[in-house]
Amino acid sequence: MTVQKDSPAVRVARAQVEAWSNHDLAAARVAVAGNATLAVTTTQAETPAVNTVVSTTGIEDYMAGLENFVKSVTPGSLKEIAALGDDRNALLMFTVEADYGSAKVTLANTRLYLLDEDHKIMAEQVVYFVSS
């Protein structure tokens, strides 16, 4: 299959991002496979890298991290910049607004997804930075 802006994998990834960015954690959870891996990185030194293996740490650990993150995200602030994918791979680029208490900031994200044969997210790689 060729790379498309609205491929099957893009639709799954987009639905998961739309869910968590609107604080719908139940819908976000449904999209994640039981053997998923998550890697989060940024070049900003004050934010630690995150690596989670759901089959080792459990979906509850993944969801606890996601819930902690989305508490600061402003619902409805998702702005998609680009999306490409095929049947199993998706690449999304977007921003969300977040408020960490001192001021609202913009989180610029690029997320790479790999889906399993059941169309669930089995690998997610997040690269982001915070901008005021």
Model-inferred region functions:
Residues 1, 12-13, 44-47, 51, ...:
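Residue-level detector of alpha-helix boundaries and kinks
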Residues 1-35:
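Short, low-complexity N-terminal intrinsically disordered segments enriched in polar/charged residues
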Residues 3-4, 8, 64-132:
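A beta-strand edge to alpha-helix "cap/lid" segment located at domain peripheries
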Residues 6, 30-87:
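A solvent-exposed, acidic/Ser-Thr-rich amphipathic alpha-helical stretch
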Residues 18, 46, 126-127:
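Compositionally biased, intrinsically disordered low-complexity segments enriched
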